[in-house]
Amino acid sequence: MQVKETRFAAVAGTCLACMLAFAGVAAVASGEEQKASADNQAREVIADAAFEYDQYGVIDASYWADKFPLEYNSYLMTAMDVPLEYGEYIAEGNVDTTSVGTDLLDGDYTSTKVNFLDEDQYPEIKTLGKGYGYAKYYTEPGGHAYSVWVVANNGRLGDLSESKGKVSCYACKTPQVHFDAANYEGEGSYWTQPITEYKDAFTENVSCANCHENEDPTTNAVLREDWIRAMGDDLDETTVANAACGQCHCDYSMAPTVEEGSDAPFESGEPVSPYYGGLASMNAEDALAFYDEYGFSDWTYASTGAQMLAVRHAEFEFNYGANPSPMAQMGYTCADCHMGTVTDEETGVEYTDHNIQSPLDKPELLASCNTCHTDLASEVASIQEDIDGRTHELGLRAEQFIFNFEDKVAIPDADGNLVFDTDTALANGLTEDQVARLQEIQRYACYYWNFAAAENSEGAHNPDMFNDLLEKGNALLDEADEILGVSSIVEA
């Protein structure tokens, strides 16, 4: 691909600066540097870093700390967003060698995160995701400073020394994996290589190199190749900053095995976003059509035979996709709402804050929002209460539908686990066509639910899009209820 010939051409030999640490405004350090332009700073950094590269190029954010301390130190603040089980991990005597900024916690690793599988949260996930990693472990996410640690400690992969996971699990957790993929010359697809062989290979968390250009580090860029394909002609200098966020904050799945001679626009195991036509195709319907075309599923639901799909958090689609959010239509960027420009109290220098958070958690940003909104916090809370509640209701209804479906088509195996059985389905009065349609409904309805449930704003980004997804999910379950002759609606 062209991106390999240009974007990664300098890796492992003549790479100058893989990325500027969090450029975006002309933020400078001190003294004479405060008078330098962003371009001059970039040249200085490149000169200083020319000999500080490894096989991936210069990807370590700490290389830029002395030149861009304001951006770098604000990035370290993402360590304040502690993952749920991090404190327990440290208390057990483990040493974390990859996360950064944890010294800012002063030994207090208390987390405010929740386990979404708990009974007072969204326990339906255990049923809707049965057979997939989501049913094993699903917590509120922590900060970017912990992204590599999370891969090894998220409860889905287990011990990486014995895990069946693949390198693709790191796709949105470290920039290193993309540089490695671009230069891979081994057997088969890089993305399907066993994670056991790479468990100690990655040390850099989500940082500078994920979002900033190599040769001109004052600009943004996209690392993930398939996202470049999915964006198509819509990836340009006006969209690249949002697309840099979107390459991870989008829906993607790990591609199935690609047969030799296939015209599939991806390789085996590659993280794939299910879109062809740029922004106009970025909606749930086009995604489902893409997955259907390639016969793709993340897993087979054992008790019903449905071919299931898992959705990652599709913030980009909710904001900039086929049905843009109100804020996107007004021209706002991800950075406007989740980063913002702040002024250093000591030097008076303005810089882009890289402690990426909800604007509700940033007083300066919230004050700016409230120049248009009367009370943004209350507005968001009202939207979230409504949409998150109805998303939960759809999840509970989809769960009950699965139970109803199982009653018609499943029998216990030798270990007592329910498995799909065609003869049982026919004996219970279903036709083969009805079974196929019910399996399709499970695939689609759960996808609509998952598309909404996994998006981190809980409705705030794009209420209209959430409403559309929930309506479509419920309409499918209405059809399923008619086929099965029993209601899936769960009374509150």
Can you say where each PLM-predicted feature lies in the sequence?
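N-terminal Sec-pathway targeting helices
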Residues: 2-17
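Hydrophobic alpha-helical membrane-insertion segments, chiefly the h-region
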Residues: 14-28
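Primarily the internal scaffold of c-type cytochrome electron-transfer domains
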Residues: 26-141, 182-205, 210, 215-336, ...
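Membrane-entry segments of alpha-helical transmembrane domains in multi-pass membrane proteins
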Residues: 150-164, 191-204
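A cross-kingdom signal targeting lumenal/periplasmic-facing segments of multi-pass membrane
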Residues: 151-180, 185
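Long amphipathic alpha-helical segments
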Residues: 483-492
